[in-house]
Amino acid sequence: MKLPVILSFLLLAAGLSADKKEKGFKSVFNGKDFDGWAGPVDNYQIVEGAIQCKKGKGGTIYTKEIYANFVVRFEFKLPPGGNNGLAIRYPGKGDTAYHGMCELQVLDSEHPRYAKLDKRQYHGSAYGMAAAKRGHLKKAGEWNEQEVTVKGSTIRVVLNGTEILNADLSKVKEFMGGKPHPGMNRKEGHFGFAGHSDPVSFRNIRIKKLK
């Protein structure tokens, strides 16, 4: 078989494999505006096809659609010391860390300002409940890839190809500061981003519903 034919076959196979991996996923952000999103969208902006929290602003923006069990894939970029969060099964009001199922941390964990945090506050952790493994974030200013799977009471986080969290929140009995999380048993809710004044960016956001 000639080399060009082999290369064409390999490229076709790679394309089919990629399509299979994305089967069932639906884009929830069009890269142009906040169509399909709710919450304080004026505190966010679109920068080069990505959702970005405005510096000094924040609040939780979320999909208008509600999800129970799902997988979300996206890319994110942190500025130095950047802080944001993923709203999981968010009810549409209140602090998602407590009133949603959880807030998954999006944090520049290695920045000096975060040297003394509780281990349940670093990137990928279910805030105040379950700690993620550290050491798999790219440098601030670079794009990371992340996948989050939410099924029943379990949450799995894969960062840049490495599993950093696999937790069953129904088994969590000790909470940071002893503060309970009344929303942790929620069965459904919105997906969103919980901004904390830093220009953290998100793009290529796709969600697949699970049974």
Regions found by a protein language model. Give the residues of each.
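Hydrophobic h-region of N-terminal signal peptides that target proteins for export
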Residues: 9-17
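Carbohydrate-interacting regions of secretory-pathway proteins
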Residues: 17-211
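Sec-dependent signal peptide recognition
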Residues: 1-8
